[in-house]
Amino acid sequence: CASCHSMKYVSYRNLFEPGGPEFTEDQAKAIAAGFEVTDGPNSDGEMFVRPAKLSDKFVMPFANVKAAQAANGGAYPPDMSVLAKARSGGVDYIYSVLLGYEDPPSGVTLEDGVYYNKYMYGNNIKMSEPLSDGLVEYSDGTTASKEQMAKDVTTFLMWAAEPHLEARHKMGFRAILYLIILTILVYFSMKKIWSRIESEV
């Protein structure tokens, strides 16, 4: 996916944060170092190229929109940072598109570089089928079926759309627990105060 699609709202440091893909910090650093970014200016006033760091956003595969369109038959690959939330149907739609490639029905003619996808709007897509059985190897021996890989891709994209979702859920739980305890304390405090008032009356 990264060869065509950008993820401009995700940083390399997100890869080892809680709730993410569970890389170690060293692994995330190694992934970042595999890409180069333009930085600067330096002390001479010139821009320079350096390996990416954890604080950098994911490196874009193309320099600009025009370059991306030129490399993809005029189509601009959408940014995948928030794709799971931006598209109607979310991850279910993305999962279906990844597995929706098939031969066009009889009588349907496609232009060169266009593929038939039964779940894509208009049934035409310029992205070739990205998944095939056995494309990757899982360290735990999981069978690399198209369905399994599509599930993994959509799970990753859902995380990328909200990398801090788990942290927010934990914070929300703590806030609710705090409010419950506070409510109980206030209730018993008020009950004690009113019992004194009633006894005096």
Predicted regions: what they are:
Residues 9-33:
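Acidic helix-start/capping segments at beta-turn-to-alpha-helix junctions
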Residues 38-122:
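Membrane-proximal low-complexity regions enriched in glycine and acidic/polar residues
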Residues 1-8, 153:
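The canonical Cys-X-X-Cys-His
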Residues 168-173, 177-201:
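Juxtamembrane interface at the cytosolic side of transmembrane helices
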